[in-house]
């Protein structure tokens, strides 16, 4: 008798994706972040669903409804903080997942990589709109500042901003539409994840050596299901430690003050996971230039397959590229730090230098290092 999981039209798909999937035998813990991102998305959708049952997207009651969730709803505080800190965990996993892709040359899977970049953009948009919903000071002013960036677009900018706002300032219409988009986008992300996996399973996973591993494959279950289970356990432990011991660690105290259009906070800054891009935006004195740099700082990821000049796929055996890669990581930490600092000396110049270094490494230094390494191979 044939096995149901191999013949049933629906179960067969799951079987080919998570059970009998041939996987390289040498993939390290860096390959755990895909499943962890799936877990984060699931947590965010579930906690978000329960929050949406009690939240009201009206400027008069939004802040009070969040307070009501935390004070009066059974375990509302837990759901709210799991959702807020779950977003931080989501971005930690995202950055590590992208970093792994850059280090081991996974971007050579062109379609998978580009859908991944679209997923990153969609997640950033979702997180931004979610930050506006509690309608605290930083929510309101963050929404005002970031949406206002679109006014830098020539000719249609101002009209576009007012169209997004639904009026002449960030108000009730803006909050309502942000809530609607914040609710629907995670489901669009989930659909894109399936397409991301579809393209990945066309080629199979990359591995640390960057070599073709067709001759040495093992079944996904039980080897990688148990490995993913360990990663999931560690992620949940980290998330719950953050939620139960220091839930406001990564938040902004200003967001505990209800939104007031007449009082601007001294330092407007986004959540920590956007600070690197915010620093790049602020480092350019021109508004349109800053917006273009901001968009390009993420969009530049799509250029990696074109800028890959090395004869080897992975950085595993390329010490020069490894060194430059870690300088890039340090530069991103520097940008994140600068994004949270006030706009004054010496932070302005540090931010500008870090921004120049960021684009230089990706567009110039890494490809040059690859060519040098190619030459060294011939010696």
Curated annotation (Swiss-Prot):
A single cellular component GO annotation: mitochondrial inner membrane
Record localization: Mitochondrion inner membrane
Instruction: Kindly list the positions annotated as binding a ubiquinone.
Output: 201
Q: SUPFAM superfamilies, alphabetically?
A: a domain/subunit of cytochrome bc1 complex (Ubiquinol-cytochrome c reductase), Transmembrane di-heme cytochromes
Question: What does the annotation say about its assembly with partners?
Answer: The cytochrome bc1 complex contains 11 subunits: 3 respiratory subunits (MT-CYB, CYC1 and UQCRFS1), 2 core proteins (UQCRC1 and UQCRC2) and 6 low-molecular weight proteins (UQCRH/QCR6, UQCRB/QCR7, UQCRQ/QCR8, UQCR10/QCR9, UQCR11/QCR10 and a cleavage product of UQCRFS1). This cytochrome bc1 complex then forms a dimer.
**Stretches that traverse the bilayer:** 33-53, 77-98, 113-133, 178-198, 226-246, 288-308, 320-340, 347-367
Q: Quote the protein name from its UniProt record.
A: Cytochrome b
Q: Which organism is it from?
A: Xerospermophilus mohavensis (Mohave ground squirrel)
According to the UniProt entry, its GO molecular function terms are:
metal ion binding; ubiquinol-cytochrome-c reductase activity
Instruction: Provide the membrane topology annotation.
Output: Multi-pass membrane protein
Q: Indicate which residues the UniProt annotation says bind heme b b566.
A: 97, 196
| Keywords of this entry | Electron transport, Heme, Iron, Membrane, Metal-binding, Mitochondrion, Mitochondrion inner membrane, Respiratory chain, Transmembrane, Transmembrane helix, Transport, Ubiquinone
Picking any one GO biological process from the record gives: mitochondrial electron transport, ubiquinol to cytochrome c
UniProt key word S-adenosyl-L-methionine: no
Taxonomically, the superkingdom here is Eukaryota
Q: How is the cofactor bound?
A: Binds 2 heme b groups non-covalently.
Q: Which cofactor does it need?
A: heme b
Q: What does this protein do?
A: Component of the ubiquinol-cytochrome c reductase complex (complex III or cytochrome b-c1 complex) that is part of the mitochondrial respiratory chain. The b-c1 complex mediates electron transfer from ubiquinol to cytochrome c. Contributes to the generation of a proton gradient across the mitochondrial membrane that is then used for ATP synthesis.
Q: Which InterPro entries match?
A: Cyt_b/b6_C, Cyt_b/b6_C_sf, Cyt_b/b6_N, Cytb/b6-like_sf, Cytochrome_b, Cytochrome_b_C_euk/bac, Cytochrome_b_N_euk/bac, Di-haem_cyt_TM
| Secretion signal span | none
UniProt main location, coarse: mitochondrion
In the UniProt entry for this protein, what further remark is given in the free-text comments? Heme 1 (or BL or b562) is low-potential and absorbs at about 562 nm, and heme 2 (or BH or b566) is high-potential and absorbs at about 566 nm.
Q: So where does heme b b562 get bound?
A: 83, 182
């Amino acid at each position: 008798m044939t096995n149901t999981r191999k013949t049933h039209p629906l179960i067969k798909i799951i079987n080919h994706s998570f059970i009998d999937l041939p996987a390289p035998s040498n993939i390290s813990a860096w390959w755990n972040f895909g499943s962890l991102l799936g877990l984060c998305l699931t947590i965010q959708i579930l906690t978000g669903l329960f929050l949406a049952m009690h939240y009201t997207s009206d400027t008069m009651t939004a802040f009070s409804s969040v307070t009501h969730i935390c004070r009066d709803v059974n375990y509302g505080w837990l759901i709210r903080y799991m959702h807020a800190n779950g977003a931080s965990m989501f971005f930690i996993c995202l950055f590590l997942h992208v970093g792994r892709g850059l280090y081991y040359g996974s971007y050579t899977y062109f379609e998978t990589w580009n859908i991944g970049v679209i997923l990153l953009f969609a997640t950033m948009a979702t997180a931004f709109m979610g930050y506006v919903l509690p309608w605290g000071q930083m929510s309101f002013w963050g929404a005002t500042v970031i949406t206002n960036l679109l006014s830098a677009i020539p000719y249609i900018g101002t009209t576009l901003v007012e169209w997004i706002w639904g009026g002449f300032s960030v108000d009730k219409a803006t909050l309502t539409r942000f809530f609607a988009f914040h609710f629907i986008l995670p489901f669009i992300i989930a659909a894109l994840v399936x397409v991301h996996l579809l393209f990945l399973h066309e080629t199979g996973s990359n591995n640390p050596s960057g070599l073709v591993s067709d001759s040495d494959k093992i079944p996904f279950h039980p080897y990688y299901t148990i490995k993913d289970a360990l990663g999931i356990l560690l992620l949940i432990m980290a998330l719950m430690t953050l939620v139960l011991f220091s839930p406001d660690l990564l938040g902004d105290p200003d967001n505990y003050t209800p939104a007031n259009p007449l009082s601007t906070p001294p330092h407007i800054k986004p959540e920590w996971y956007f600070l690197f891009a915010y620093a790049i935006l602020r480092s350019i004195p021109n508004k349109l230039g800053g917006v273009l740099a901001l968009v390009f700082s993420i969009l530049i990821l799509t250029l990696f397959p074109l800028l890959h000049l090395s004869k080897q796929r992975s950085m595993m055996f390329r010490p020069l590229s490894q060194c430059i890669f870690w300088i890039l990581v340090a530069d991103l930490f520097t940008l994140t730090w600068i994004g949270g600092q006030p706009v004054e000396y010496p932070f302005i110049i540090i931010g500008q230098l870090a921004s120049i270094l960021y684009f230089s490494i990706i567009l110039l230094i890494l490809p040059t290092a690859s060519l040098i390494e190619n030459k060294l191979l011939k010696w």
